Curated annotation (Swiss-Prot):
This is FH2 domain-containing protein 1. Interacts with CEP170. Residues 16-89, 517-638, 706-1143 are annotated as: Disordered. Residues 848-861, 995-1018, 1071-1080, 1117-1130 have a biased composition (Basic and acidic residues).
Length: 1143
């Protein structure tokens, strides 16, 4: 095949066409690197190749062309050429080219046809490639390499041949290892041997020199090398080195001397360092006083722990015992005896804790060992001594090493001395710690102290961590205690705060200053008794609160400057739910401050921080203060023309027996000016008349009554202000009808309406004497029952706020709901209580938020009007009268057994609440105050709870005791839940027994006693609704209160309003306990809620609850009890009347 190819290639060459074609194709295909790659003319490349090769090898020109084409073969068109190209072209002399991997066209497709390749063949002469250039660029260097390789090969071959000529004496493997070792020195074997001979170790390390010792020839090898008599130059590298080494005398000793000389200084330096460290560590242990103190502490602790035992009373202990301290666990988790020792050391001196810092070298001894140091030193001695002895045989070597040996010996002696000193000190240390020299080693001693230092430091750190943790825990506990205290203070003092004697005393001492804490509303906690469930709260945006606010604004504008409420001691509250202000009847600043403080206290009890003060106590104090200031207070009120409805929950004190002793200066009796409409002229009897007047709290007055008081205020106030003593029962009797008309009777027991001193209502301008009833319980006290109830839920309502009430004629906002409208004492029977009082009353009775009470107040005014209107028709006596004229509120004087000091606002009439929500039932309650609304009942529970906490006396007759247990404690009692008072629709309210109804009785006795007896005669209710409606401001006319007022005429007939007022009345009913009961019945949509619930209960026990309430009151006086019962019945009637309104 190859021959054929060669022939074909030769023929192609001869043809020339092919040769030219390949040349052309090469020109045509510059990309192909190989010069003869043209596929169709593969022979042509051979031609060129052959041309080139012909001179070199003319006989085999064909084969060379093939080899010339192998670079082209990838593209050769014909297989034969390809194989031929793959032939021996490379083996030929021609330079090999890099292959160009292309795809060739079969030759048969190209030849004999007209195509680009045949054309190119024709024009090949025009395009010729520079073969030399392409060879230079793409020729492989293999040729050169091969040429050089053969030369190198020849050289190597010659060297190998020479090596082969070398003589190898040593083992091949050993010879190789030695050769590798020697190459690192980059010196000839002879120079290395010369350095060894001369003892020059500078250029060699100790390790290198030691390697020389390893490669020293063995005896057999020495014999062979010595036996070698041939050409030394022919020996291998290793053999040559060993051969030259054995020629050096004592070569082995010389190398050893070189190694010792090289290693001696480092070894000596290391020994010096180690010995120094050990000796220093020994000194540290013996001189560290802190360590010694720690050891003594350990000894003391051990003796204490082991006292009485065989190990007790020890004088010392083994050092190894130090490590056992951590193993003795303490009773305290995570603590052991070592921790205790560390604590004791800290107590003694904190410096003791840092003793380990003075044992710095002891820590370094961890890597050292006295034995190792001694062994190393001994080795140096041996080596030096051996060398010294051995070199004696070789004078030349001895001279070389003489200086070194002298230096080494000197150093070794010095080290030996150091070592000896170290040993002595070690023994001294062991003796110092009373250890056995034979058993205790220095290394062990150091190890014990190292471990002890480590453990002690860890114990110190643990103690610090523990102390820090304990401090953090204590801090957390303190914070928790503070939080708990703050909550407790909030719950006990701020939440559900009711008037208490303590607060009264505090305010007595501090005066106006003491009011500041009470003016700040406190958060209501669900756990606090004053907490009002959200479902019973009314949003400030609700219609009731907005109406109340409008009414408040209206009253303020009508009465005069908004500051007038302050004049009447209606203190502004910081929050919308502020405690209701006390009546302004108390002129003197002290009295006013007391009143305001009292009012705020009850207000606080309603929803603020103030500690619950027994309403009775406050009432007594207020009453006492009022008699002193009533005269001036009333005139001022009149002059101011401000219709300030004081706490509608405060009982009309004037209704109490006129003979009750004056209250203590702090007993802030709410002087309520009632415009008794349709009532006989008041018997203003000296102090009695004033007291009764004071007993008739402003809550007894309907807003219109207050307004009329404002108009009549100067006269009636002058008359009433003549004395704060409660009016004679006759006068009270005369008042009672008006109260019945205005629903005063219901209001009196539960809450004395704060009569607006200045009459904002022109209709009420009737010049009738206002009863400035100094309620034995402060207006705030009165609020305790009714307001307290409301205030608890409403704690921040502005209506309850002193100013809010004042501006609304605070009684209107709070007491006005029930008492103001119910007590139209000063207003003509025909006149309806001002809508203001009505609004205030609903706010109180409604149990809605104070904002809502404001709305209620607006609504209540109409209600009161309607109640009053109904009350004129209804006879006060009996529940029937109550139902008809439950609105009317009879003024009751204190019975002989009663006194103002005993007076407290006790919602007695609420007992009938369980009867059902019916204002008509209020008429049945006639003597009793307004039936507690469902809210009142709820609040009554809360208030009764607070009353219970405040004082038993504050607790009114237990509702459970009363037939319907609807009787409510005065403002103090409101917290007591009235179980019997339940609206059918409203959730049943538990009856809370009023532990001290007597105090409340006194309040009620004052308000109710006269009321019930005289309410009956005063049954003629003053249909003031028409008047009230005209009076109702435009904003109040559209309110529920206005509609309820309009409906109030129908109130007596409509006895069922349970569904309407349940939520609102539940709390407010409680709040309105005594004065509120009347008030809700009288007027207030809010009251309506309470009265609604109260009527329900009152029908069941309208008289019964009142009787139950009266029972405690009977303790104060049979008259009071009777009056309370009458009030309860009247309240029932009012509740019945109000129920329709609520609907």
């Amino acid at each position: 095949m190859h021959v054929m190819n060669c022939v074909s290639l030769v023929s192609d060459k001869e043809n020339g066409n092919i040769a030219t074609a390949p040349g052309f194709m090469i020109g045509q295909t510059p990309p192909p690197a190989p010069p003869p790659p043209p596929p169709p003319p593969p022979p042509s490349p051979p031609c060129s190749c052959s041309r080139e090769e012909c001179p070199s090898s003319p006989p085999p020109p064909p084969p060379p062309p093939l080899p010339g084409e192998p670079p082209i073969p990838p593209p050769p068109p014909g297989l034969p050429p390809t194989t031929h190209m793959n032939g021996y072209s490379h083996l030929g002399k021609k330079k090999r080219m890099r292959s160009f991997f292309w795809k060739t066209i079969p030759e048969e497709q190209v030849r004999g046809k007209t195509n680009i390749w045949t054309l190119a063949a024709r024009q090949e002469h025009h395009y010729q490639i520079d073969t030399k250039t392409i060879e230079e660029l793409f020729g492989q260097q293999e040729d050169t390499t091969k040429s050089s390789l053969p030369r190198r090969g020849r050289t190597l071959n010659s060297s190998f041949r020479e090596a082969r000529e070398e003589i190898t004496i040593l083992d091949a493997k050993r010879s190789m290892n030695i050769g590798i070792f020697l190459k690192q020195f980059k010196k000839s074997p002879r120079s290395i041997v010369e350095d060894i001979h001369q003892g020059k170790s500078e250029h060699y390390g100790s390790e290198t020199l030691r390697e020389f010792l390893k490669f020293l020839p063995e005896s057999e090898e020495v014999k062979k090398l010595k036996a070698f008599s041939g050409d030394v130059s022919k020996l291998s590298l290793a053999d040559s080195f060993l051969y030259g080494l054995i020629q050096v005398p004592n070569y082995s000793l010389r190398i050893e001397a070189m190694v010792l000389k090289k290693e001696f200084l480092p070894s000596c330096s290391s020994l010096y360092t180690d010995i120094t460290v050990l000796r220093t560590a020994i000194k540290e242990l013996m001189s560290c006083e802190e360590l010694h103190s720690i050891l003594h502490l350990v000894l003391q602790a051990g003796n204490i722990m082991n006292a009485g035992g065989y190990a007790g009373n020890a004088v010392g202990f083994k050092l190894s015992s130090l490590l056992k301290l951590a193993d003795t666990k303490a009773n305290k988790p995570g603590m052991n005896l070592l921790h205790f020792v560390a604590q004791e050391a800290q107590k003694k001196d904190t410096i003791l804790l840092n003793f380990s810092e003075k044992l710095h070298h002891v820590q370094k001894t961890a890597r050292l060992s006295l034995e190792n140091t001694e062994a190393e030193l001994h080795l140096l001695f041996v080596r030096t001594k051996s060398l010294k002895e051995n070199i004696q045989r070789d004078g030349e070597l001895c001279q070389q090493m003489e200086d070194f040996l002298q230096f080494a010996i000197e150093k070794l002696r010095e080290l030996e001395c150091w070592k000896q000193e170290l040993q002595d000190e070690a023994y001294t240390l062991i003796d110092f710690f009373c250890e056995d020299k034979k058993t205790m080693k220095l290394d062990e001693c150091f190890q014990i102290f190292r471990d002890f230092c480590t453990k002690f430091n860890k114990a110190v750190k643990d103690n610090h961590d523990r102390e820090a943790q304990e401090l953090r825990q204590l801090q957390r506990l303190k914070e928790q205690e503070q939080k708990q205290r703050s909550w407790a203070t909030g719950e006990l003092g701020a939440f559900g705060r009711s008037s208490s004697e303590n607060d009264v005393e505090l305010l007595t001492k501090k005066g106006a200053e003491g009011l500041l804490p009470f003016l700040h509303p406190r958060p209501i906690s669900p756990s606090s008794p004053s907490y009002r469930p959200p479902n019973t709260r009314r949003s400030r945006l609700s219609l009731g609160p907005s109406a109340d606010r409008e009414l408040l604004t209206f009253l303020e504008s009508s009465t005069g400057s908004p500051e007038e409420p302050n004049k009447f001691h209606s203190l502004p509250r910081s929050s919308p739910r502020q405690a209701r202000p006390t009546i302004a009847c108390l002129e003197p600043a002290e009295v006013r401050h007391q009143d305001s403080s009292f009012a705020h206290k009850p207000q606080a009890s309603g929803g603020q921080e103030e500690a619950p003060n027994p309403p009775s106590a406050q009432a007594h104090q207020l009453a006492a203060a009022q008699p002193e200031n009533h005269a001036s207070a009333f005139p001022r009120a009149r002059r101011q023309g401000v219709s300030v409805l004081r706490k509608r929950y405060s009982e009309p004190v004037s209704l109490g027996s006129a003979q009750s002793p004056p209250l203590s200066p702090l007993a802030l009796g709410i002087k309520e000016h009632e415009l008794v409409t349709g009532l006989a002229q008041f018997n203003l009897q000296g102090s009695q008349g004033m007291e009764e007047t004071s007993q008739l709290t402003l809550s007894d007055f309907s807003p219109m009554e207050l307004e009329s008081v404002g108009h009549r205020g100067p006269q009636s106030l002058s008359a009433s202000s003549s004395s704060l003593t409660p009016m004679g029962r006759d006068a009270l009797g005369s008042l009672s009808p008006a109260l019945e008309d205005g629903k005063a009777a219901p209001d009196e027991p539960g809450s004395a309406a704060l009569g607006s001193v200045g009459s904002s209502d022109p209709e009420n301008k009737d010049p009738r004497p206002l009863f400035c009833i100094s309620d034995t319980t402060d207006c705030s006290l009165t609020l305790d029952c009714s307001e307290g109830t409301d205030s608890r839920p409403r704690g921040g309502d502005p209506e309850e706020g002193g100013e809010g009430d004042g501006s609304m004629s605070s009684g209107v906002g709070e007491m006005g709901d029930s008492q103001v409208s119910s007590n139209p004492t000063s207003s003509p029977p025909g006149e309806a209580p001002a809508p203001v009082s009505v609004d205030s009353e609903p706010s109180c009775k409604g149990g809605l938020p104070r904002d809502k009470p404001t709305k209620r107040k607006d609504v209540v005014a109409p209600k009161r009007g309607s109640l009053k209107e109904a009350s004129p028709g209804a006879s006060k006596p009996g529940s029937a009268r109550r139902s008809q004229g439950a609105v009317a509120k009879s003024v009751r004087t204190l019975t002989a057994s009663e006194n103002e000091s005993m007076r407290k606002v006790m919602p007695i009439t609420k007992s009938s609440r369980g009867a059902g929500w019916r204002r008509p039932e209020l008429s049945s309650r006639g003597p009793s105050q307004n039936p507690p609304s469902s809210t009142d009942t709820v609040w009554s529970r809360q208030n009764s709870v607070r009353r219970a906490s405040t004082g038993a006396e504050e607790q009114r007759l237990p509702r459970g005791s009363s037939g319907s247990s609807s009787t409510r404690p005065g403002r103090d009692v409101p917290l007591q839940p009235r179980g019997s008072f339940k609206k059918p629709s409203a959730k049943p309210l538990r009856n809370l027994p009023r532990q001290k109804p007597e105090e409340n009785k006194t309040c009620r006795a004052h308000s109710e006693g006269p009321e019930s007896p005289k309410e009956e005669p005063k049954t003629p209710s003053v249909p003031s609704v028409p008047h009230e409606l005209p009076r109702v401001p435009s904003f109040a006319r559209n309110t529920v209160a206005s509609s309820s007022r309009s409906m109030r005429t129908d109130l007596p007939p409509v006895a069922k309003a349970p569904g309407i007022t349940r939520t609102v009345s539940q709390r407010q009913l409680r709040v309105k306990g005594d004065p509120e009961d009347a008030a809700p019945k009288d007027s207030s949509t809010l009251r309506r809620a309470s009265s609604a619930r109260a009527p329900k209960k009152r029908p069941e026990s309208a008289e019964g609850p009142s009787a139950n309430t009266e029972a405690p009151l009977k303790a104060r006086g049979a008259g009071e009890r009777a009056s309370l019962r009458r009030k309860d019945s009247s309240r029932t009637t009012l509740g019945r009347i109000l129920n329709p309104l609520r609907k």
